[in-house]
Amino acid sequence: MYNSIYGSPFPKINPKVRYKTALERAGFDTKPRNPFSSQRNASTGSLQASVKSPPITRQRNVSAAPSVPVTMKSAYTASSKSAYSSVKGESDIYPPPVLENSERRSVTPPKNSNFTSSRPSDISRSISRPSERASQEDPFRFERDLDRQAEQYAASRHTCKSPANKEFQAADNFPFNFEQEDAGNTEREQDLSPIERSFMMLTQNDTASVVNSMNQTDNRGVLDQKLGKEQQKEESSIEYESEGQQEDENDIESLNFEPDPKLQMNLENEPLQDDFPEAKQEEKNTEPKIPEINVTRESNTPSLTMNALDSKIYPDDNFSGLESSKEQKSPGVSSSSTKVEDLSLDGLNEKRLSITSSENVETPYTATNLQVEQLIAQLDDVSLSRNAKLDMNGNCLNAVDRKASRFKKSSAYLSGYPSMDIPVTQQTSIVQNSNTNLSRQTILVDKGDVDEDAPSESTTNGGTPIFYKFKQSNVEYSNNEGMGSQETFRTKLPTIEALQLQHKRNITDLREEIDNSKSNDSHVLPNGGTTRYSSDADYKETEPIEFKYPPGEGPCRACGLEVTGKRMFSKKENELSGQWHRECFKCIECGIKFNKHVPCYILGDEPYCQKHYHEENHSICKVCSNFIEGECLENDKVERFHVDCLNCFLCKTAITNDYYIFNGEIPLCGNHDMEALLKEGIDNATSSNDKNNTLSKRRTRLINFN
């Protein structure tokens, strides 16, 4: 029981059995190998001689590619097969078939090397030992040999041009003697697909540095063949270019730069050169004779003539002609437009109308446009007659100038009420077929209000009607004569809201004069701002809401300048908004500067001294005339007292509830006989004074100013 509970849960280890280690269980190969076998360096990827190195356990290299043994065919053809079979049986790695062409070159080993062994380790050892001895004697020997062979190869390029001779000479100059390949092998290597060739290059680069150098020397012949072919192509292209240059020179010499009369006849534009003066003359002759524009829709599409082409081709010569044509065309357009509307014009009106029509009128008037203009004119006539009925004070009708086009776009004139903000300009009228409307409009016009330079007859600006605007007359009426007309004018005015009065101040001023004549209850604020009327007035204008900056922000509230340096502001958000310069922080009533001895009182977001604060706040005691701060008593007449100051005159008790005022000045509590006091009086006066005694009741409440 003891061992089964507290013992080891694992079975006991058998000493006769060899258990796998952690590396073996993980899959690593921990078996010892031949110490003379080639090992791959993980950092450089090159083969190093392992003769003098101690036996190392072989591990799997994940990053490096599997090494492929190099088979030598020429010197040991029989042993290469056995080596291949041994490699196949030992590591189960088959060399790729692509490497057959690249590995057929054999190396003639030095005399000291031994190729009797069939293991690939002996091959790598025989290859690496001469390179080690050569690198120990002279480390730069291989590079100097390559430079010398490159020079010899460059010198022999001109002498022997056949690829076979080049390959033979390059192979003799290399430090390693390689066997020559067959013609079939070279053709087979050249016929490789790009994918197989890239795979061959990758596998060659992945092998050891010595084998890589051997492969580079093997590929030297192929490179020489390619270079020879490229050189032949370059020489042929140079010869072709030289022949082409000679042909170009011959072509240039054969060119004839003399003028050809046939070519000139084909290229010149005879209508432009011959007809241009005539076309210009015809344009000058025909422009003043433009007929009147017909009211049709077909005339809207302009036609492209030869004159327009001439103006585009010759802009400098035809510029003056264009100006003259503009000046000559504009009267024609104006005359046609006025003829459609049957208007009679002066010379001055004709001149103004031509300018406006040339600027504003782009298309001629159609029949539908004419009907719309007549309808607008009738509506304007109705509005003018309505305004004439409202004009009971002798206000004259005035029109807006043609240049003030922004007023013509609006339909505010249809409302029938005058707009006083528009300046008074020239006097015009709309000519209608009916003479009654014309007479009714011209009767109300005052000659003193019409400008002298205004046109005598009515005109239209491009067919649109001119709208009448009103000017407020400055005629003052007496109390007897003017009140009747003002009363009638007042009854006809509708009720206008306060938002409308902000945009129509002249109507407000007129209403103010009427109210001032009747009552003097209205008053003006001290700052000269908005006017307030009495409670029975029909119009009241509210004060505009001023923007308030947070405490410590915005310009100085006293001078309006930016606050730099020392500033004064309230640390509480609900006390004072904005900020001041230190020297500008004063009482708004007396101008005394605030400091440690002069406190600041805040009332209505304004700073006051103590005296003016209590005057504005009505917090001065009526008994002692001192300032009230804290609790106080207030009666129904908004009179305030200190709690200790309001006492009964007779018994000297403090009054906290309702009390009485005897003869308008003496406070009395409710504990006394009021009827006896009315008859006898307080000082026991004679009965003759009984009729003069008065008594009134006051109600009080307790308030706190804190």
Swiss-Prot record:
Residues 237-252 have a biased composition (Acidic residues). Gene3D superfamilies: Cysteine Rich Protein (2.10.110.10). Residues 24-192, 222-258, 279-341, 514-537 are annotated as: Disordered. Residues 556-612, 621-672 form the LIM zinc-binding domain. Pfam families: LIM (PF00412). Residues 35-64, 296-308 have a biased composition (Polar residues). Transmembrane segments: none annotated. One of its GO terms (biological process) is regulation of Rho protein signal transduction. Disulfide bonds: none annotated. It comes from the Eukaryota. SUPFAM superfamilies: Glucocorticoid receptor-like (DNA-binding domain). Residues 73-86, 117-129 have a biased composition (Low complexity). GO terms for molecular function: metal ion binding; Rho GDP-dissociation inhibitor activity. The modification Phosphoserine is found at S43, S63. Present with 1310 molecules/cell in log phase SD medium. This is Paxillin-like protein 1. It comes from Saccharomyces cerevisiae (strain ATCC 204508 / S288c).
